Regions:
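Extracytoplasmic catalytic/substrate-binding loops of multi-pass membrane glycan-assembly enzymes
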Residues: 13-15
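A short acidic, glycine-rich active-site loop
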Residues: 61-65
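PLP-dependent class I/II
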Residues: 2-6, 10, 20, 27-57, ...
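Short beta-strand to alpha-helix junction loop
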Residues: 69-70
Length: 392
């Protein structure tokens, strides 16, 4: 018996891009100490008060079936947060709670694409994007951003791919590049969506991690409220990655359909986790800033290290917990550089090629270890790159 085409073709017959990460984990399992700069996992755990509230809610009995769209108070809090940050009036009817941002991405594409529909996404991309699109039986089509444009997508390139497409997925602040899309970029994207009648799915899980520029939700742009679904999550903003709690914000009629989808798939999110998420949101912006601050510090540390040499270049990262580094001067691909760095110095980074063709010749560094260790790893990475150019 064979598995379904839907499941067996999720990876598209190719790599999932995680070979270097898997090699690093094999080394760790064998007893080798490895500095991991690979995945976007905070080096702190979920704050004790949030866990205490989660425990209180669970012991208090919120362990049965919870409201499938999400508990009203949490949906209201997210709606108020979105209204305050974007100026777009938002109510609980525009919000559905999901088991994390990944589930929100899957649900959003299920809502707006039918089997065989073309779904666009920007390259470089978060590694799950094309598989998510295949998982809903859409046809994934990448639109390349360019290093020469600091990975700001060109509206003209999106328009060239948009004929007959149904949706476009964007992510700002961006994983893997750390790029924050400018207003000009987003206005161009919005114009393409209006011109070609595209649904826009905006992954905004890094919206609290802004180092330069501003976060603009495209749902707030003219004519976009009724054609945009926004994906949000507590994972990055509140260091709640394992709690698996996210949301979709969009038109009320689409949210009602997503509630039907959840009824037949996830059947909602545990009530005690939703209670803890509500508690976390009520801690306010000061808490979100506290969670984001280590990445701001480490970005500054990395930029200082990079300024002291001229082999490794930095993509302008205005947000998120990552840096994309240009290592083309070494003559190696991102993958070859990552493997070499791992074997020579036991430092694990992600090859740019893991995130699409546009990031070839780059590596992604996650700023997710303690400051002094991160600074030391960056110095070693740059010294390794310089050694390669000396050998050449």
């Amino acid at each position: 018996m064979q598995a379904s085409q839907r499941i067996s073709t999720i990876l598209g017959g190719g790599s999932d891009g995680w070979e270097v990460f898997n090699r690093a984990r094999q080394m760790i399992d064998a007893g080798t100490s490895v500095t991991e700069l690979t995945i976007g996992e905070h080096d702190i755990r979920t704050a004790a008060p949030i866990l205490q509230d989660m425990h209180r809610a669970a012991v208090g009995g919120h362990t049965g079936y919870a409201s499938i769209p999400g508990i009203a108070a949490l949906r209201d809090a997210i709606a108020a947060r979105v209204t305050a940050s974007t100026g777009v009036p938002t109510t609980r009817d525009n919000v559905m709670i999901t088991p994390g941002g990944q589930a929100a991405l899957f649900a959003s594409h299920t809502a707006v694409t039918d089997p065989g529909d073309t779904a666009l996404y920007i390259d470089p991309y978060y590694a799950t994007y094309p598989g998510t699109l295949r998982g809903v039986c859409a046809k994934p089509v990448a639109v390349q951003a360019h290093a020469s444009d600091a990975f700001q997508p060109r509206a003209s390139d999106i328009a060239a791919a948009a004929k007959g497409a149904k949706s476009l997925l964007i992510n700002s602040p961006n994983n893997p590049t750390g790029v924050v899309y400018t207003r000009e970029t987003l206005e161009g994207i919005a114009q393409v969506c209006r011109d070609h009648d595209l649904w826009l799915i905006s992954d905004e899980v890094y919206d609290t991690q802004i180092w330069e520029g501003e976060h603009i939700s495209p749902r707030a742009l003219e004519g976009m409220e009724e054609r945009t679904l926004v994906v949000g999550s507590m994972s990055k903003s509140h260091a709640m990655t394992g709690s698996r709690i996210g949301w979709v914000v969009g038109p009320a009629h689409v949210i009602s359909h997503l509630v039907n989808l959840a009824t037949h798939t996830t059947y909602g999110v545990a009530g005690f986790i939703q209670d803890a998420a509500l508690f976390a949101l009520e801690l306010g912006k000061e808490f979100e800033t506290e969670i984001a601050e280590p990445f701001r510090r480490r970005r500054d540390l990395a930029l200082a290290v990079l300024a002291s040499q001229n082999v490794v270049g930095a993509v302008p990262n205005g947000g998120a917990m990552y840096m994309m580094l240009d290592i083309t001067a070494t003559g190696l691909s991102g993958e070859a550089f990552a493997y070499g760095l791992l074997e020579a110095h036991h430092i694990a980074v992600m090859p740019g090629e893991s995130f699409g063709a546009a990031a070839a010749g780059h590596i992604r560094v996650a700023m997710t270890i303690e400051d002094s260790a991160f600074e030391a790893a960056m110095k070693t990475l740059c010294a390794y790159a310089e050694s390669l150019t000396t050998q050449a």
